[in-house]
């Protein structure tokens, strides 16, 4: 989580998917298998933990029930935000959770606007390097989120 131009908190959790299904191609990308997530919490529990962390960072003086609306007004940043937002909407639907109209900012779009054709591609690790960030463990959720934060702070 970023506040006043600084990363002030981070959060990582594996999530047991619903249904407990693992796509071969997805496993090849991120290396997560069923064995890794057998004891992991489901999305709704992880999202609740994340809301509590966001509340501590941004709204520590208020009750959680009072700030769910305010959490929804915070900007969310992703590299290829259309994909990530689509995944988030889908999982909210699976768990029958209300999806607020989150405001996403896209570092992929910002990269294309800033760097144009000066980069060989606009993949996360390429853009991170162009912004002076050394992305280690690409496709690990926390590592990718930290790289995305660095790109956002550089470009947005």
Task: Give each language-model segment a name.
Residues 1-89, 101, 121, 125, ...:
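Conserved non-catalytic scaffold segment of RNase H-like nuclease domains
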Residues 83, 140-153:
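Acidic, divalent-metal-coordinating active-site segment for phosphoryl/phosphodiester hydrolysis
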Residues 92:
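Conserved hydrophobic residues forming the short capping helix/wall of the S-adenosyl-L-methionine
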Residues 98-105:
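Short hydrophobic/aromatic-enriched beta-strand-loop microsegments
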Residues 105-121:
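Short alpha-helix plus adjacent loop in nuclease-associated cores
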Residues 128-130, 149-156:
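Acidic two-metal-ion nuclease catalytic site recognized across multiple nuclease folds
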